[in-house]
From Swiss-Prot:
It comes from the Bacteria. The active site is at C131 (acyl-thioester intermediate). The lineage of its organism: Bacteria, Pseudomonadati, Pseudomonadota, Betaproteobacteria, Burkholderiales. Its EC number is 1.2.1.10. Pfam families: AcetDehyd-dimer. This is Acetaldehyde dehydrogenase 3. Belongs to the acetaldehyde dehydrogenase family. GO terms for molecular function: acetaldehyde dehydrogenase (acetylating) activity; NAD binding. One of its GO terms (biological process) is catabolic process. Keywords: Aromatic hydrocarbons catabolism, NAD, Oxidoreductase. It catalyses: acetaldehyde + NAD(+) + CoA = acetyl-CoA + NADH + H(+).
Amino acid sequence: MTRKIRCALIGPGNIGTDLLAKLMRSPVLEPVWMVGIDPDSDGLKRARELGLKTTAEGVDGLLPHVQADAVQIAFDATSAYVHAENSRKLNALGVLMIDLTPAAIGPYCVPPVNLMDHIGSGEMNVNMVTCGGQATIPMVRAVSRVQPVAYGEIVATVSSRSVGPGTRKNIDEFTRTTAAAVAQVGGAKDGKAIIVINPADPPLIMRDTVHCLTETAPDEARIVESVHAMIADVQRYVPGYRLVNGPVFDGNRVSIYLEVEGLGDYLPKYAGNLDIMTAAAARTAEMFAEELLAGRLALQPAAQAA
């Protein structure tokens, strides 16, 4: 049997449970622990049924088992408010943290844009921005790699049913972190992010709108080509990522309209916001796992982790 890198998941909510389904299919990652705080949570129950070890004592319930169970990568799908402490405790044991909260204490990772930049940099914490960021930043980058973008604005519309209590508590962090990453990763000089939580029933599929203001008149042909190439890159790990309309050109404004259909691993297919976040996190962790398995990466305990 091929050796796999063992992982722990923190937070058995919508995102953590959807991520677990993806990790169960991974050729290089083996989920062994699910960490929560409510012993009666559906996510912990599902994890136990799938053969994972579980604790309802939070990260402190996992720490004594990290070395015995050879956990090397942890995914935090809890809240920005507790992530820094979770990361500090696990980094101190040499565990690499993939952050699915908007805490953003580590560098941003949007796989089709900057995944390979994280190889060999020695970081012990990478941040997956937000679901809105994962869906829209590739499009901002698709424009900015053609010509300078003065301003990028994204609007992510998601179904109320797909947004759990952790995400709801982090709305301000969501908008700040996404806007910062639109600039830092997307390449816009200034960024803004808006999230709309839609209570419609039946639930609507995730929809995203991206507006970019270019500094000079848009090179329409090259932007169209760049956008389609980037969409193909995202579809490699999120097959339900689709261009609905655009790029639409109006003066220096370039507008791109997207929808994201999920695989239906945990919530139904309308919850593409879960899918794009968890698929990006799994893709990022697999890259690190491949480096670990090949002997090109060694994780060091971080004495003074963030």
